[in-house]
Amino acid sequence: MWFLILFLALSLGGIDAAPPVQSRIFGGFNCEKNSQPWQVAVYRFTKYQCGGVLLNANWVLTAAHCHNDKYQVWLGKNNFFEDEPSAQHRLVSKAIPHPDFNMSLLNEHTPQPEDDYSNDLMLLRLKKPADITDVVKPIDLPTEEPKLGSTCLASGWGSITPVIYEPADDLQCVNFKLLPNEDCVKAHIEKVTDVMLCAGDMDGGKDTCMGDSGGPLICDGVLHGITSWGPSPCGKPNVPGIYTKLIKFNSWIKDTIAKNA
């Protein structure tokens, strides 16, 4: 599982500790500049770790398995190495993983049929509110169930090399379809539950992967998921990726934000 590879690499003190995997957004393209203004880059110290989504000026949503001990985020970034005056840097004052996410599964182990990565989401409260601009904008949570067969867009800075984890310079986008959960049940040994979405290209070649975790899955123009987990190597035929199904967590997200305002 590729998110476990990333987590273990970070916990060992460096990205270069990751074993060989093919890990990037496959079959994607450079996102049009500033076309994903809700996209967040989540760092551990000064190393890029995961994607995220800006929900409002004070809160970022990401994956629970992106939990670390020292967060900082960038908003409004397109390219990691270009000077982008419109981008905003923020520290994080509080991290709140979903209480039902099983953090013990992040320990190194052989995947088992009983492994359940449900509830893979976490809220980050910014130490200073984001300035809402043309290139930094929040996105709304979904208000209804996503439709099977919807065209979805995922984005992130997943690795561009198959051996050493190295984020893409430019924000990458990829399009694929929302699939029945049964397709993912057949493809994965780990549990696929009703709080997950199954999405990808059954022909292979289009996928999210290590480094894309926590980033948005937008189907028919609506934020419906965040990248959670998938196969390693990524982009395999008949093995779609798994995304946290946000409609199932609207109440928890809103209640948590209200209690920690």
UniProtKB/Swiss-Prot annotation:
<dbReference type="InterPro" id="IPR043504">
    <property type="entry name" value="Peptidase_S1_PA_chymotrypsin"/>
</dbReference>
<feature type="glycosylation site" description="N-linked (GlcNAc...) asparagine">
    <location>
        <position position="102"/>
    </location>
</feature>
<keyword id="KW-0732">Signal</keyword>
<dbReference type="GO" id="GO:0004252">
    <property type="term" value="F:serine-type endopeptidase activity"/>
</dbReference>
<feature type="signal peptide">
    <location>
        <begin position="1"/>
        <end position="18"/>
    </location>
</feature>
<keyword id="KW-0865">Zymogen</keyword>
<keyword id="KW-1015">Disulfide bond</keyword>
<feature type="disulfide bond">
    <location>
        <begin position="209"/>
        <end position="234"/>
    </location>
</feature>
<dbReference type="InterPro" id="IPR001314">
    <property type="entry name" value="Peptidase_S1A"/>
</dbReference>
<keyword id="KW-0325">Glycoprotein</keyword>
<dbReference type="InterPro" id="IPR018114">
    <property type="entry name" value="TRYPSIN_HIS"/>
</dbReference>
<dbReference type="InterPro" id="IPR001254">
    <property type="entry name" value="Trypsin_dom"/>
</dbReference>
<dbReference type="GO" id="GO:0006508">
    <property type="term" value="P:proteolysis"/>
</dbReference>
<feature type="propeptide" description="Activation peptide">
    <location>
        <begin position="19"/>
        <end position="24"/>
    </location>
</feature>
<keyword id="KW-0720">Serine protease</keyword>
<keyword id="KW-0378">Hydrolase</keyword>
<feature type="active site" description="Charge relay system">
    <location>
        <position position="120"/>
    </location>
</feature>
<dbReference type="InterPro" id="IPR033116">
    <property type="entry name" value="TRYPSIN_SER"/>
</dbReference>
<dbReference type="Pfam" id="PF00089">
    <property type="entry name" value="Trypsin"/>
</dbReference>
<protein>
    <recommendedName>
        <fullName>Kallikrein 1-related peptidase b5</fullName>
        <ecNumber>3.4.21.35</ecNumber>
    </recommendedName>
</protein>
<feature type="active site" description="Charge relay system">
    <location>
        <position position="65"/>
    </location>
</feature>
<feature type="domain" description="Peptidase S1">
    <location>
        <begin position="25"/>
        <end position="258"/>
    </location>
</feature>
<feature type="active site" description="Charge relay system">
    <location>
        <position position="213"/>
    </location>
</feature>
<comment type="function">
    <text>Glandular kallikreins cleave Met-Lys and Arg-Ser bonds in kininogen to release Lys-bradykinin.</text>
</comment>
<keyword id="KW-0645">Protease</keyword>
<comment type="similarity">
    <text>Belongs to the peptidase S1 family. Kallikrein subfamily.</text>
</comment>
<feature type="disulfide bond">
    <location>
        <begin position="31"/>
        <end position="173"/>
    </location>
</feature>
<dbReference type="InterPro" id="IPR009003">
    <property type="entry name" value="Peptidase_S1_PA"/>
</dbReference>
<feature type="disulfide bond">
    <location>
        <begin position="50"/>
        <end position="66"/>
    </location>
</feature>
<feature type="disulfide bond">
    <location>
        <begin position="184"/>
        <end position="198"/>
    </location>
</feature>
<feature type="disulfide bond">
    <location>
        <begin position="152"/>
        <end position="219"/>
    </location>
</feature>
